């Protein structure tokens, strides 16, 4: 399977033989398993205060008083006297079955499964039906996957990267990501995650020589070195088919890393 190689002006200058994994079937089940495992392994343990609800001297009255035998606040002639405390059904009591920091959230994925998931996610980037299903705008994209000369990795100015996106038909997808940014629903908006930001173009290079600096300010654009490429880069949210740009050098690294 061959793909055209474009220069920074969007002109076809060469062809490259794509690695065999671009022709593999897309296994959504493996991709989802790998992405969810990666997300679970980043979770930070959390739990309640072990003493929560126990900071009281309340004691049960025992049997024979015609009331429930729950711990009750001591004292007389004040509003809290005799009020239930400590138990889960009482105001200010402990939480029933509270989360504990000892819980292990990690998930393990077999080595061959994880490798197959990455190969499958790469294959989805070459299939227009998966890229469109993710919501990417590819009307002006000449070919999938997009392969661009190695000079791409040295672009360190936002203006240069913007002109490159326009020349190869990727700018429409960047604008889609910019216009679809929205305020997050729920409490996350006040926890440093105010906006939900769509993903747009992923750039995969063999070595960063400035492209991260040039691309970082464009909405939804990510840059990753081929040696560190993961399933989550290619399938955010476990949805395969991200609009991806490869350099020939990156393809060589991936073939060496994932080849048969």
Swiss-Prot record:
Transmembrane segments: none annotated. The keyword Ribonucleoprotein applies. One of the primary rRNA binding proteins, this protein initially binds near the 5'-end of the 23S rRNA. It is important during the early stages of 50S assembly. It makes multiple contacts with different domains of the 23S rRNA in the assembled 50S subunit and ribosome. Forms part of the polypeptide exit tunnel. One of its GO terms (molecular function) is structural constituent of ribosome. One of its GO terms (cellular component) is ribonucleoprotein complex. It comes from the Archaea. Keywords: Ribonucleoprotein, Ribosomal protein, RNA-binding, rRNA-binding. Part of the 50S ribosomal subunit. Belongs to the universal ribosomal protein uL4 family. The keyword Iron does not apply. It holds the Pfam family Ribosomal_L4. GO terms for biological process: translation. This is Large ribosomal subunit protein uL4.
